[in-house]
């Protein structure tokens, strides 16, 4: 794996661990567990930690968006149900008035 000279030793370790994880994941039906050395390297790298935090934040925002959409759908259904009940009450009142007028 060629590495440029302007990368420090820590960057090189992180890159090698990322390559190890990706290649194990993509090349085997049952991926091998990540080596302890790579696990520690990746856990200690602030860039990886930042990416994971960002990923968790995006997941949380997506969950909030889905929850909001579900709440709006439920509110819309409640509003539609209330409108249908109001229309049914008006219709019943109109029928009552029509019967009263027919009796005259």
Swiss-Prot record:
It holds the Pfam family Granin. Disulfide bonds join 17-38. It is found in: Cytoplasmic vesicle, Secretory vesicle; Secreted. One of its GO terms (cellular component) is transport vesicle. GO terms for biological process: adenylate cyclase-activating adrenergic receptor signaling pathway involved in cardiac muscle relaxation; defense response to bacterium; negative regulation of catecholamine secretion; negative regulation of insulin secretion. Its main location: cytoplasm. InterPro entries: Chromogranin_AB, Chromogranin_CS, Granin. The keyword Disulfide bond applies. Keywords: Cytoplasmic vesicle, Disulfide bond, Secreted. Belongs to the chromogranin/secretogranin protein family. Chromogranin A probably has a paracrine role in the regulation of secretion or maturation. Dimer. PANTHER family: CHROMOGRANIN, CHROMOGRANIN-A. This is Chromogranin-A. It comes from Struthio camelus (Common ostrich). The lineage of its organism: Eukaryota, Metazoa, Chordata, Craniata, Vertebrata.
